Amino acid sequence: NIEINLIGVPKNYIPGKEYLITLEIKSDNESIGENQGGFAVNVSDGRLLVVDKMNTQILEGYLTHTKEGSRYRSWKFRWKAPSRVVDEVILSVMGVASNGDFSPNMDAVGTERIKILPVKSKK
């Protein structure tokens, strides 16, 4: 059982604007160790930017947690919207609520996809 919350994602983006986003993972899956969870974020357009170098990183095109960042279930990052208008941007998230036993057994895993549309121009 896992819930993925993204706070700060706009319904409609302004081209070139940066948005501060908080990713929260909620689960009744309790950890018996230091490791609490993890995540991977991908975006179809624009750029993902690291805010907290200790706990997040860009790895092979994904924004993800670091080893230190696996101690948490909440992370912050920025998304810079594309500089030109595109019909839609898809923000994809995979989240894990770890049970802390250093194996994938009994970890809660979930995904979330959010569609972000451009701000409508006033005519």
Regions found by a protein language model. Name each.
Residues 1-123:
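Short, conserved sequence motifs used for protein processing/export or organelle targeting and
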